[in-house]
From Swiss-Prot:
This is Growth arrest-specific protein 6. CDD domains: EGF_CA, LamG. PROSITE patterns: ASX_HYDROXYL (PS00010), EGF_1 (PS00022), EGF_2 (PS01186), EGF_3 (PS50026), EGF_CA (PS01187), GLA_1 (PS00011), GLA_2 (PS50998), LAM_G_DOMAIN (PS50025). It comes from Rattus norvegicus (Rat). Ca(2+) binds at residues 326, 328, 437, 652. SUPFAM superfamilies: Concanavalin A-like lectins/glucanases, EGF/Laminin, GLA-domain, Growth factor receptor domain. One of its GO terms (biological process) is positive regulation of ERK1 and ERK2 cascade. The gene is Gas6. Residues 1-27 form the signal peptide. Glycans are attached at residues 189, 417, 488. It comes from the Eukaryota. The modification Phosphothreonine is found at residues 609, 617, 633.
Length: 674
């Protein structure tokens, strides 16, 4: 075996080879991580020239002939590689024979022993390259891999979420950023941006679309709920949720609670429960036990009936104090049968009128001042010899010659019937018809020298027979009844053939005691409320407590106007309806329309059609209708006078009037002292 080259020669050869290699090699740039792996503080074979030299020595020393461990040490020039090589070298000889056997597998086995990357111990999937070291090796890992053999996945997501703004998914040797639902991954593959789903008009269908971070919401108006299946807003039937204490009516997007107004109830501030309708203005309701109210019986029948019997001929003497604002009615009747002899003292146009019939011959006389001014005055009727004398405040206003006396002889006794506040027979039997109903008050009466003391005891025991101590002009509605008329609101114009025109003009002068109640209404067949004007203390659609006057056709409010109900003052409510027009005014201020022009015309057309049928005009309340048929069903409480189509309504001429309603007198507001 030739001697190995000396150290100086070997070093020179190595430097020359290194020089040649540096001239001919291409520049190689490694990433920082790869470079760092190469610069580990361990001895490495950095240059290929040393490997080639080592292989030459190895072939000469250990392949062509058997080498000892010391000779192998001279080849590798270090202990680690020698210690690694020599036991494996001996294993190659055991498996393939000695060098002199010339087995090619032996040569291959020996030549591969110094290269510790053959076979490659590094994980193939995670290794970029294997670096042979002195008795060792180094696995240069690909990005995302670690460990000695590059077989350990690096979890990039464990450090700052891998740089992902939302979701980091670790994968073998890698990772991937992802976004939550409703976000999209941007071009940097790390950032996420919200997706605006509302840019697609079909996202929510009929509902409003509101974009949210990573999502969206389909919104409906209050009272509606969104159906994701049909992509529409569907009405919520709140009435199925038992929200109302009494009656509930569902409507698109809302609901309305109703209370039994005729039972004295209205909606509470929560708009769901009911509460009592209580007066907010106190009226002076005190009555006098020494007074007799003449208007208690709407039928026109007398409130008092007396029958006198005498053994001797007797003359009539009647005296009383009287007070009224009523222009017409009967004070009292005295006499016998309708076809015999009698007198009726009444009022017509505010003046005293005497109708009399003696022996079948009737007469009428009227004289004296107007006395329906609401002040007390003393009236007397005295039967003298062949004369009747009528006085007002002791002044004679009438003196009528008569033939005979009012007491009639019958079965040996002289009889006289006397009735107060009405007549004992039909109006048609009068000399001239008169409305017998009289809203008047009588006191200090004296019939035939006081032989009627029982009347006073009867009046004391019955407050309905008593008068208010103080009254003013107007009609008083106590809140528990109504009146109605049969009025016509249509007419056929001769100028345009048979075309039917209609008009409803209402002027109501009111001084309310409560904030809820029907002022007037038109009611058709089957108790359908065609039109109503009423006080109400809430706005039904806005569900807001507010004192209002409402004009409605059936259950649809056409107009609303605010009113100070509880200020103790008189207010004027004006309503005008005709083709194409519906207005509501309170104290000269026009109300706000609640419907569109098309909706208004639709309601007016319906009203016009209904007015051509049977219609009753109700004042102060309604019959027993459904609470849902009109905005208000409660009775009105307070003072009111009413004009309809230019004519003042006289409650004495109504088709019906509740007996507690006073036609021409109203108690004043009670002034409460602090």
């Amino acid at each position: 075996m030739p001697p190995p080259p000396g150290p100086t020669a070997a070093l020179g050869t190595a430097l020359l080879l290194l020089l040649l290699a540096s001239e001919s090699s291409h520049t190689v740039l490694l990433r920082a991580r790869e470079a760092a792996q190469f610069l580990r503080p361990r001895q490495r074979r950095a240059y290929q020239v040393f490997e080639e030299a080592k292989q030459g020595h190895l072939e000469r020393e250990c392949v062509e002939e058997v080498c000892s461990k010391e000779e192998a040490r001279e080849v590798f020039e270090n202990d680690p590689e020698t210690d690694y090589f020599y036991p494996r070298y001996q294993e190659c000889m055991r498996k393939y024979g000695r060098p002199e056997d010339k087995n090619p597998n032996f040569a291959t086995c020996v030549k591969n022993l110094p290269d510790q990357c053959t076979p490659n111990p590094c994980d193939k999937k995670g290794t970029q390259l294997c670096q042979d070291l002195m008795g060792n090796f180094f696995c240069l890992c690909k990005d995302g891999w670690g460990g000695r053999l590059c077989d350990k996945d690096v979890n990039e997501c464990s450090q700052k979420n891998g740089g992902c703004s939302q979701v980091c998914h670790n994968k073998p040797g890698s990772f991937q950023c992802a976004c939550h639902s409703g976000f999209s991954l941007q071009s940097d593959n790390k950032s996420c941006q919200d997706i605006d789903e509302c840019t697609d008009s079909d996202t929510c269908g009929d509902a409003r679309c509101k974009n949210l971070p990573g999502s969206y919401s389909c919104l409906c108006d209050k009272g509606y709920t969104y159906s994701s299946k049909e992509k529409t807003c569907q009405d919520v039937d709140e009435c199925q949720q038992d929200r109302c204490e009494q009656t509930c009516v569902n409507s698109p997007g809302s609901y309305t609670c109703h209370c039994n107004g005729r039972g004295g109830l209205k909606l509470s501030p929560d708009m769901d429960t009911c509460e009592d309708i209580l007066p907010c203005v106190p009226f002076s309701m005190a009555k006098s036990v020494k007074s007799l109210y003449l208007g208690r019986m709407f039928s026109g029948t007398p409130v008092i009936r007396l029958r006198f019997k005498r053994l001797q001929p007797t003359r009539l003497l009647a005296e009383f104090d009287f007070r009224t604002f009523d222009p017409e009615g009967v004070l009292f009747f005295a006499g016998g049968r309708s076809d015999s002899t009698w007198i009726v003292l009444g009022l017509r146009a505010g003046r005293l009128e005497l109708q009399l019939r003696y022996n079948g011959v009737g007469r009428i006389t009227s004289s004296g001042p107007t006395i329906n001014h609401g002040m007390w005055q003393t009236i007397s009727v005295e039967e003298l010899d062949r004369n009747l004398v009528i006085k007002v405040n002791k002044d004679a206003v009438m003196k009528i010659a008569v033939a005979g006396g009012l007491f009639q002889l019958e079965r040996g006794l002289y009889h006289l019937n006397l009735t107060v506040g009405g007549i004992p027979f039909k109006e048609s039997d009068l000399v001239q018809p008169i409305n017998p109903r009289l809203d008047g008050c009588m006191r200090s009466w004296n019939w035939l020298n006081g032989e009627d003391s029982a009347i006073q005891e009867t009046v004391k025991a019955n407050t309905k027979m008593q008068c208010f101590s103080v009254t003013e002009r107007g009609s008083f509605f106590p809140g528990n009844g109504f009146a109605f008329y049969s009025l016509n609101y249509t007419r056929t114009s001769l100028d345009v053939g048979t075309e039917t025109t209609w008009e409803v003009e209402v002027v109501a002068r009111i001084r309310p005691a409560t904030d809820t109640g029907v002022l007037m209404a038109l009611v058709g067949d089957k108790d359908v409320v065609l039109l109503s004007v009423a006080l109400v203390d809430y706005h039904s659609t806005k569900k807001l407590k507010k004192q209002l006057v409402v004009l409605a056709v059936e259950n649809v409010a056409l107009a609303l106007m605010e009113i100070k109900v509880c200020d103790s003052q008189e207010h004027t409510v004006t309503v005008s309806l005709r083709d194409g027009e519906a207005t509501l005014e309170v104290d000269g201020t026009k109300g706000q329309s609640e419907v569109s022009t098309a909706q208004l015309q639709e309601r007016l057309d319906l009203l016009k059609t209904r007015l051509q049928g049977s219609v009753l005009t109700f004042v102060g309340g309604l019959p027993d209708v459904q609470v849902t048929s009109t905005p208000v069903t409660a009775f009105y409480r307070g003072c009111m006078t009413l004009e309809v189509n230019g004519k003042t309504l006289d409650l004495d001429t109504a088709s019906y009037k509740h007996s507690d309603i006073t036609s021409h007198s109203c108690p004043p507001v009670e002034h409460v002292t602090a």
